[in-house]
From Swiss-Prot:
Pfam families: FGGY_C, FGGY_N. GO terms for biological process: L-arabinose catabolic process to xylulose 5-phosphate. NCBIfam families: PRK04123.1 (NF003154). Its EC number is 2.7.1.16. Pathway: Carbohydrate degradation; L-arabinose degradation via L-ribulose; D-xylulose 5-phosphate from L-arabinose (bacterial route): step 2/3. GO terms for molecular function: ATP binding; D-ribulokinase activity; ribulokinase activity. This is Ribulokinase 1. It comes from Staphylococcus saprophyticus subsp. saprophyticus (strain ATCC 15305 / DSM 20229 / NCIMB 8711 / NCTC 7292 / S-41). Gene3D superfamilies: 3.30.420.40.
Length: 538
């Protein structure tokens, strides 16, 4: 019997799972919130801009070291039976490192410099740089963005590098390496400077044929090609291949052997596709968490407007992985719940429910034909299909009689409408959707949300019996590179979890939600395309 370890780094916490490679059974789990949290309001007493989201790299390494030690001790498995480790990470999260792979913000003279810290995926301080990159491409060579939806997102690697170049050049000068946080951890585990094709393919303008797009970079800034060559270039390892053996340092720390193979890191949502087993053409997977990432696999590459990327071999070898996304989903539900009147909070406590659970209970009783509230789900900007992080959310249709649960239900519905905009974009560009796999912890907890999605999308929605799909997907990658099965597809088939439940669309609800979607789309196009300045905060 052999085991693998999957390490899942989300927005707020890290999780380490020890998993049986024969059937995907989770043997031991370690979960820890990041001690420093997300740094978004102030840094060491200095106020930060509203769109800054930073983190502390020591949180990642402490979870790595403590978590693996814990699951090994807790499970009591033979260390020789551990064959591989996989890591997923929320992306695009960027770390700036010195020559010794030490994060720059750990240097005392840079501890007050925000641009020396980890830039979390939802850090939107690089919007001006992203807008400029799009303008350059439109003017010089629009084909540069053919496979990025003809957009540049401020969350990606190159805009964030340019942001530091423009706002804190001393940080850029002192950095020897700039890499995704997932690549940073894999490089530590292997004692190599490694890049995953998944991360740089989707977030770094890199493809398997040409490498980095240096022509594009030079048109943006003449210094950018050299910055990328010296600080970002290194051997690229594809998903499904081994990044290397576990380094002697970690062998000694954990009591493991050199046979342990390390997978290149995979973006967390992409790992969720593996975790739920949605690895065939026509399977559409929204990985629903803090935000939502929408993934599809297809043997062909199509230039789809407003879809944020397509990369070969980034999830399953031989297939192109397509990605789109919504910048806030679980965050939206938490935001809505945080606004609940005190009387609702008191009732929730009286009934032994969380405020989210109580609001959902009330929202489930609101018939669709009575819903008159519409929300634009742009509280953290719009990733797809508008790719504009400056857009802000809106609520329409309020009256003096509107109950709070109707507003909360409108938040749930808005995320389904946003997902439908994305699904239609795929289907209108020769990538048909047959089945929807809802991944992540939220679909397990919220049958109401899954029911809304099934009827808004007019598709069967399959929920897998695992709220840990991303961590399980990472463990699958560890098992695969460790040699548990001949191929990654075989690994997934053996280790995926069973179906928890399926939700079929109902004709009456589908018809009712089509009317609400038309209202959402009209507002979406009006405030997102025709008059976006009305949604901007100056």
């Amino acid at each position: 019997m052999t085991y693998s370890i999957g390490i899942d780094y989300g927005t707020a916490s890290g999780r380490v799972f020890l998993v049986d490679t024969t059937n995907g059974e989770i043997i031991s789990t370690y979960i820890k919130e990041y001690p420093h949290g997300t740094i978004s309001e102030s840094l060491n007493g200095t106020e930060l801009p509203h769109n800054y989201f930073l983190q502390h790299a020591a949180d990642y390494t402490s979870i790595l070291e403590e978590g693996v030690q814990y699951v090994l001790k807790d499970s009591q498995v033979d260390p020789k039976s551990i064959i591989g480790i996989g890591i997923d990470f929320t992306s695009c999260t960027i770390v700036f490192l010195d020559d010794d792979f030490k994060p720059l913000h750990l240097h005392p003279d840079l501890e007050d410099q925000p641009h020396a810290y980890v830039k979390l995926w939802k850090h939107h301080g690089a919007q001006d740089e992203a807008t400029y990159m799009k303008q350059v491409s439109d003017k010089v060579n629009p084909s540069w963005l053919n496979f990025y939806g003809h957009n540049v997102n401020s969350e990606w690697m190159i805009p964030k590098i340019l942001e530091v170049k423009n706002k804190a050049p001393e940080v850029l000068e002192r950095s020897a390496y700039i890499m995704e946080a997932g690549d940073y951890l894999v490089s530590l585990l292997t004692d190599k400077n490694i890049r995953s094709n998944c991360g740089i393919g989707f977030k770094g303008f890199y493809n398997e044929t040409d490498g980095f797009n240096y022509s594009f970079f030079e048109a943006i800034d003449q210094e950018l090609p050299e910055i990328v060559k010296t600080k970002c270039e290194s051997p690229v390892v594809n998903i499904g291949e081994s990044a290397g053996s576990l380094s002697p340092y970690y062998q000694n720390l954990w009591g493991l052997t050199e046979q342990v193979q390390i997978s290149p890191y995979i973006i967390d949502a992409h790992s969720g596709v593996l975790g739920v087993g949605a690895i065939e053409q026509g399977e559409f997977t929204p990985v629903i968490g803090t935000s939502t990432c929408h993934l599809m696999l297809d043997p062909k590459q199509e230039p789809i407007p407003a879809i944020t990327g397509s990369v070969k071999d980034a999830i399953i070898p031989g297939l192109y992985a397509y990605e789109a996304g919504q910048a806030a989903v679980g965050d939206l539900f938490n935001y809505s719940a945080s606004l609940a009147p005190k009387s609702y909070v008191d009732q929730a406590e009286k009934q032994g429910l969380s405020i989210l659970g109580y609001l959902e209970k009330l929202a489930a009783d609101i018939s669709i034909d009575k819903q008159h509230v519409t929300v634009l789900d742009w509280h953290n900007g719009n990733r797809s299909i508008l790719s504009d992080s400056k857009l802000t959310g809106s609520i329409f249709g309020l009256t003096l009689q509107t109950p709070f649960e109707m507003i909360h239900k409108a938040y749930l519905e808005s995320t389904a409408f946003g997902t439908k905009m994305i699904m239609q974009q795929f289907e209108n560009n020769h990538i048909p959707v047959e089945t929807v796999y809802a991944a992540g912890g939220i679909p397990i907890k919220s049958e109401l949300l899954v029911d809304i999605y099934a009827n808004v999308l007019n598709k069967e929605v399959v929920v897998i019996d695992s709220s840990n799909a991303t961590a399980l997907g990472a463990a699958m990658l560890g098992a695969n590179v460790g040699g548990a099965y001949p191929t990654l597809k075989e690994t997934v088939k053996h280790m995926k979890q069973p179906v928890y439940y399926r939700k079929q669309p109902e004709a009456k609800k589908v018809k009712q939600y089509a009317l609400l979607f038309d209202r959402y789309k009209a507002l979406h196009d009006l405030l997102g395309k025709e008059y976006p300045q009305l949604s901007y905060i100056n």
